């Protein structure tokens, strides 16, 4: 693959295969062969070029006898020698949508056995203790509970508990209980939904308020609101509920905003005098000496008051993220530190990142500026996995270990995280759901080379001989994920691999168990005069929907790829006619131009855009003017539009 100066233009010269296989666990594995000229259909190429890691709840457990869910992490490095394609693929755990209430009870710990775990759980999650004395009493009795950020598992459990509570009482909206009912009417609500959560009732109460109070998600404060907030603060003091009601915001929101608001705050770069003053105040209030590491036990409100020119948030951030590290002689953070951080967290063998003691982890690490800074560094690393919020923590760690250990020359990595439920029957919806993001790339070879491709039903070879065909059946549709440009490739009737290879030199994408259907889209591309096919693109790709004019009245969702019309294939025979295409003249045939008879067939190709994608304009195909629509320049579509004009 030769890449020009413009990164969006890629010229592919060689022929390579992309092989999808499916193991016994239902995991999709993508094989990336090297450009070494080996026969892609030979047995030697079946040796996997990836490494797989299986994770299960109990090692050695028979998967057929287990009701647990198993996860696999598959990583595929793209090396310098493998220039055939670029692929980014991720997969998340998918569960059956229809679960019986008994199954929900088992998974959420609502059954009687879960409630009998011990008095330590009930003592914490069933008590309204808010004072230090109450907490000390429970600690002295040996009780422990979780603090800090809520994990995905905790939030899922809380939401399930709320849904069950509402279902049992015939209530539709939880806001009726939280904001409208009296304390007497909702007295058992918080104790019921806190079951299985090792957190105090007050923590559950605060979490629920933040989740369901719409006033907590209003947005950034305007200058007018700031001025009004100052007036209300002078009038009502610390009556946050009254202030929040007057502003249309939650009490916690106005409290946090007032805490960070200060009229005398400077902005921008800190001066040397401000840094010196901050260091003096911190060491004075904590009783430490210059050069000592101070990360805990600091009243930042008091620090800000004595510094005078910065808010407590500014003081805290400046000290923990820079000044403390600078004065103690710290070193710079490197790529090796990224690897060590993931390794050290994995060695802790914790089930959730909230169990990590960042003070201990940061201790003695010269390049760590503070425990808080180290935690933010971890957040930056884990965001490299787009669906990190949906993955169990051990699975996320396994994937991240391969990502951070990649050398600079192999920055492009393919991370596949698959899962299956051992006893779950295949669901028509969740049989195979994989979020996939694959840039379109085309190779161009002679027909003889293309006919020599392997007949393996799980291998796809993009060969362009005299004609190249892509067939997309209506049984496929794309379900958007939370990540822009990434979608679920979803099949409806089978769990087998949804891609097969046709026997001819053309390429067909079809569902293995789906019958042939006349409602399909066939996109044809002619051979070019040159030996190379140039594809202009950027990441991520696009979805092309083809519909007839009578269907344009119905809105088309971005989440579904449907074929409503067949684009007619051009044949070299002069005697063959087609009602959808006017017979071209001899001169037009030499130029490869075609004219559509708009009175017979009216079709529209809808380009569903995604961030960063584009397609060259037909008016000036050689210029830099582009439309933010697609990624693929198709000769047929260009000639059709030129003929129509």
Curated annotation (Swiss-Prot):
The protein's location, in the record's own words, is: Nucleus
The ranges of region (Disordered) come to 34-71, 95-119, 568-645
Gene Ontology CC: one annotated term:
nucleus
| Basic and acidic residues: compositionally biased ranges | 587-597
The annotated regions of Polar residues compositional bias extend over 615-625
Q: Does the keyword Transcription regulation apply?
A: yes
Highest taxon, organism lineage: Eukaryota
| UniProt family annotation | Belongs to the DMTF1 family.
Q: What name does this protein carry?
A: Cyclin-D-binding Myb-like transcription factor 1
- Origin species: Danio rerio
